[in-house]
Amino acid sequence: MKQSNLLNAQFARRLFRTAFSSWQLLAVMLIVCMNVAVGSKLYAQSNTIAVKGKVMADGEPVIGATVLVKGVSTGTATDMDGNFSLNVASKAVLVVSSIGYETQEVPVNGRQFINVVLKSDVVTLKDVVVVGYGVQKKVNLTGAVSSVSTDELEGKPISNVLEAMQGTTPGLVIQQGSSTPGSVPSINIRGLNTMNNNDPLVIIDGIEGSLGNLNPADIEQISILKDASSTAIYGSRASNGVVLVTTKKGKAGKVEISYDFMYGVQQPTSLPKIADSWVYAELYNEAAVNSGRAAKFTPEQIAQFRNGGPNVNWVKELYHRNSPQSSHNVSMTGGNDQLSYMASLGYMDQNSMFKGPDYGYKRYNARLNVSHKVTNNFTLNLTSQFARNDIKEHAYWTEWIIEQANRMPPIYPIKNEDGSYNYPAGSNSNGLQRLEEGGYRQNVNDELLGTIQAEWEVYKGLKLIGSAGGRVWNNNLHENRKAFEGTGDSENKLTEQFYRSKNITTNLMVTYNTKIGKHSIGGLLGYAYEGFSEKQFSTSRLTEDSKYDIFVGDLSGDKVSNGGSASDWAIYSGFARATYNYDEKYLLEFNIRNDYSSYFAKGNRSGVFPSFSAGWRISEEKFWSVLKPYVPSLKIRGSWGLVGNNRIGAYQYMQTVSVKNGISFGDKLAQTAEFASTNPDLKWETTRMANIGFELGLLNNDLNITFDCFNNRTKDILVNLPVPGLFGNGAPIQNAGKVETRGWELSVSYRLKTGPVVHNFTGNISDSFNEVIDTRGTEIIGGSDVQTIIKEGYPLYSYYAYRSDGFFQNEEECQKGPHLEGITPKPGDIRYLDKNGDGVIKPDDDRFIVGNDFPRYTFGFTYGLEYKGFDFSMMWQGVGKRNKWMRGESVEAFHNNNEGPVMDFHQDRWTPNNPDATYPRLTMGAESANNAAKSDFWIQDAKYLRLKNAQIGYTFPQQWMKKLYVKNLRIFASVQNPLTFTKMKGGWDPEYTGDGSGRSYPVARVYSFGLNVKF
């Protein structure tokens, strides 16, 4: 399909070209300045002397402190006793630094022995947190911001960073519904605020990016911005929260090389629990008789199944027992006080658990981050990343393959005695053959992301900062699908697809920070532009011969399908921030942003998003001095503000046309045009956020507690309300909804040192609940097999179904009880509540709101132990309340008149001798109509507790490694997802996020080992 903008949004493209030119100019400036500066810095001094010294802090030697000669790359590091030696010029200046301490410059002045005493770096110890367009000390934060420690990422056999973040932060809801190679878990912050996209904004080094392509080993810090105070600076796309990622930077000192390696094997955490073949045969006979049919299996056949006959779990046969996974990461950092760098390479190889030729996911990462201090007040920074992910999979649909395998009875072998694939009577599918011989689909994605930043300190405290960056994403898809005779796939298919997107971002900011007595004042004023463009083309061809894996020939005809699209948008913004604190006790902050977006028509393009927050560090008051030994820190804070959401399709306020091949004349296809519904009055969704919280430190701040409660209300939600059929087109989008989301968060951390043993404990729990406030009185019902409703007074996307009321126990109950329209129930069938009391169960009259699948009471806790080089940690994560509507062959015996499946829980079915069963009487075909109705009987309790990761490691003593010229060496063993506790029936994973059919690639359990080494 080709989409064109009839009104030609020229201003978006004009701004895009202007910003791109600015980006090119800054790139040239960076290259010139770096070359001039590097070339001009020549170090030449005479009178070289040998200097020895010792670096101390708090009466103890500082191990590994960096000692550099100012202005050059000459340097060393202190040994186990804090000693160093260096040949320097007699008039040189030494720059001594170490993490957690203030950097000191020490003139040599001809001395041959120098003692250096480092002072604690107060800012470092009090923790700096990355926020929008800057950093702040954590103690002075007035917004709801959480940080994910990089310790959470280490030693875990993960394919993307989101898997490691799950359960680490309150209010951060991550669901890993599948471990499909290359897939990324879903992410949400503080629940659902809208009927549209609820994904948070992800910013990587100042550029919008993807967490799925990021190498976890490159990450320095992750900040989760959750309230208006912290997100309003991002304005129109911040209503769902913001994830800020800062990657590692270079540091002055000797070159340090790090290498990380991990190897593991994957196994499915859970698979459908299919009944054994002899049990299946017995229950099949019972279902057939209950349905007025003859029994199929004789007692002799059943005995044969029991005594060594076929007993095959077709779903299990789709997967390898063990599938390898490995990763390699190498990085190099170094530099001096003027230029520092960090370069890294990463490789991830995740084989598919599916059987088949060479399926899996490969990711290649390369990064270069450079910081160059051109002069004392002018600095240039470069961050750059290249990522390629290569996904190779089967050419069909995973849902289809799993569906057909799940429906296959265990009485049939998956292969015949001659090795050919078995197609039992009535079946047109063998999932294993589709995997092994059905062709392949390959997606190759390339991402190039980079930022150039120039920072000029015009005057003490006054800085001018300019940056430009971009992201280019290319996707190339190639598919060669092979047909199988008699399976319904009689023709081979070749597909080629290309997609490219470009994103350009520029920022210009002025910042000012000063301190006057006890008054600390800060300000920021900025301008930002972002432009995006994309285009896509695809073509498919049906062929008679599958041996050719290239796309050649005529591109038109009834066996060829072509399509394409293109779009672009732009947004430019002004923003400001003002901060004030008095003696670090009374804290104030104000943010505002004005966005101007091409998503909306003139007159509606501007959106203004302010926020205000305040905090009070009660523990810094004089009257608190008596309590200070018991409660050393206490802060209360609150915030209020507005943020926006413009995540709708482009051009929806304009009249657009779609052109496609719609009518066939002989062997030629004629093009047809479709005009979309429009609404020129569209405007921003706006979310009002309110938050109040406190932070409490006890036991000398070894025990820290943080609590927040919040209330968000979104108005003018962009939604397609139903329209009458006479309208003649799809419903136009309009601002017609309101949703309120309420919730709370609690996190606790505790550090305990008992002799040589250090214990670390962290835990968090949170909840959010949303309620639809207004849809103009309209109910929006969606879904087919699983139906949901958007209705005033209830959560978004609530399940909408009949409410079950046990089973009919006898004929009298069947005659007197309510029944589905047109169906006469029998004893053992599900009985439904008659909502309006007319005796007939009908969709329009008798459905209830019966649950919701969004997770509530999400929690996570970790325990870590360190003892003389040994370390152990475990991380648990779970959900306290969630419903999951399972359907089809995932729960129904003999679903849709198929031969299977029969699950383990079907054995506890209703019979006259088992009236208190958990499953209705067994039936098949038309006799199943009553029980197969959409009701809460099929909704399961999906709360769970899962051990996400456990690992044990050992770090070798430095005195051992020093002889091998190794700075640090750690070896470890780890397991991901080893244990799950859940009430879900049938072996289905409680994190499953699909449509309820169970047709999903499983979550993986991974056993691994690895090492971390630094030189």
PLM features per residue range, with description:
Residues 139, 252-312, 352-447, 467-572, ...:
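Surface-exposed loop/interface segments of Gram-negative outer-membrane beta-barrel transport/assembly proteins
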Residues 247, 259, 276, 330-336, ...:
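Residues on the lipid-exposed face of transmembrane beta-strands in outer-membrane beta-barrel proteins
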Residues 358-372, 605, 609-615, 967-978:
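Short secondary-structure subsegments characteristic of cysteine-rich extracellular domains
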